[in-house]
Amino acid sequence: MTESITEIRINDKIFKAKGTYLFGKTAKKYATNEVDEETGKKLETDGVTSIFMGLMQQDPDKLIEFWHSATSHYLKEQPSFEEIATTIEDIAAETGDLKPYFVGALRMLNEDGYYKGKLQTLWFMMKRSSQNKKGEEKEKAKESQELFVELYEEITGKPPYEIKA
């Protein structure tokens, strides 16, 4: 089974990642706004989804944003963004492998109670969106959804959840 790390040591203190209301509140800083090149429409992605999608791409910057959000429940003891970034950089330099941290982050968001429903809805919507399209657009959406399922399985060693659409 793929190793899953949901704790991080910063300044000799261990912090456990939690998906809570405060996670979402902190994650709002990491929401993204992009413009679809094909349609010209503005695409807004909330912070939790933005972090999740970045984790799927094993983006270390999104891993730092995840830990910044996931330690927000510590309130007065929360490590700073810079402390988290330095720790993640040190782990990458020492071990050469952040994958267990990506696995832990993805599983926490996708499987633990607070954001489980939100992410199940995201998976459902990805699957359903391909069913509402026609021709090449439908094929492209289906390939994209399959790619994300494969990515999740490749990283975490298990399927995201049973998608019934």
Functional labels for PLM-detected ranges:
Residues 1-14, 42-53, 61, 73-165:
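Charged interaction scaffolds used for protein-protein
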Residues 1-41:
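N-terminal leader/targeting peptides and immediately adjacent processing regions
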Residues 19, 68-71:
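Generic secondary-structure microfeatures
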Residues 19-23, 63, 101:
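Alpha-helical structural motif
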Residues 56:
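Active-site nucleophile-His-acid catalytic modules used for acyl/amide transfer and hydrolysis
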Residues 59-69:
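Elongated alpha-helical scaffolds
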